Amino acid sequence: VDVMDARSLKRHPGGVKDFQQTMIGAKVLGVVRRGKFLWLPLEVPGEKRALAMVGHLGMSGQMLLRKPNDPEDKLTRVVIHLKTSRGKLAEFRFIDQRIFGSLAIDELQPTDDGKPGGFSAGVGKGKSWLNLIPMQAAHITRDPLDADFDEAAVLAKFKKKNSGIKRVLLDQQTLSGIGNIYADEALWRSRLHYDQPAATLSTAKAKELLENVRQILAKAVEEGGTSFDEQYKNVNGESGYFAVSLNAYGMTGLPCNRCGRQIKRDSWMNRGSHYCPNCQKLRV
């Protein structure tokens, strides 16, 4: 385990040496995701606790799986040398330009609802780690692609929120997995203004919004995400192409694909909100 920049382990309470000692000899049991957290349940020799390596990409992080002789990746912060079940060597490389992301070893705890910890956890059906979640991610609710996503609970939360619907969509304790890009796209598809109070949405409109979120996230996953530069790639280092499907985000000044009116960008919470002023009117 090579650590080039200790800042990438800032959420690991034991420091660099503890991270290295825990990972050396550990066996990766699976890969699980909830929202923007990704974790690898571990079997650590001599360790009775259920542990996992937890990763968060922050704004610019990447987790790449490389062959040992592959060219060095710029801005690599951590390298974990692996041996596959077939005896082949590989490298897990954590790359992060802005160092907002992190890796950490965290203890696993039972999920609140007794169901699998997150998306893809089902591949290990019957495994001891299946219904566990890292303590660092326990406060994050399920995302709309999760098989155990509780739509009724989210709709009930909407009814209690007077905040703008975009702010609610980005609240990881209401639902997870939605960033600025996909929030703008879901709101455009649903004809909703970003500042429309969540509580004013009818049940039908709220359900329509959640369904649009699901469809957009599913398509984005299928197309490898939205890659605008070298910071956004999959585990094999390949760029996604969902950017060609965008209707609102980054389309400032271009005609709306629905009505032809120019897409507008408003400054919002230190970022931007992209919307059609004709299709997405604020209704009071």
What are these regions (language model features)?
Residues 48-177, 182-189, 197:
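Phosphate/anion-contacting hairpin/loop surfaces
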Residues 21, 39-41, 66, 94-96, ...:
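Intrinsically disordered, low-complexity regions enriched in small/polar residues
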Residues 1-103, 255, 271-284:
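A cross-family signal for N-terminal binding/gating loops and helix N-caps
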Residues 2-22, 32, 48-50, 153-284:
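Basic, nucleic-acid-binding surfaces and adjacent catalytic neighborhoods in DNA/RNA-processing proteins
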Residues 16, 40, 47, 62, ...:
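Intrinsically disordered, low-complexity regions
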